[in-house]
């Protein structure tokens, strides 16, 4: 009977560890997604600014 209780305690600890690690992984994924979205926004802004600069250069050349 005691071995069953020990096994259950170990299983409970293992489940807690897995749950905690799962939360850590989700947190890291959210941080990664946030960084990716920021990079996409920065790239879009740079592209927009480059188009504006090209338009200005084309107007000056005319």
Swiss-Prot record:
Alphabetic keyword roster: Membrane, Transmembrane, Transmembrane helix
Cellular compartment(s): Membrane
Domain of life, per lineage: Bacteria
TM regions (residue ranges): 17-37
Example of a GO cellular component annotation carried by this entry: membrane
Family matches, as Pfam families: DUF5408
The protein's name in its UniProt record: Uncharacterized protein HP_0085
Organism the protein comes from: Helicobacter pylori (strain ATCC 700392 / 26695)
Lineage summary: Bacteria, Pseudomonadati, Campylobacterota, Epsilonproteobacteria, Campylobacterales
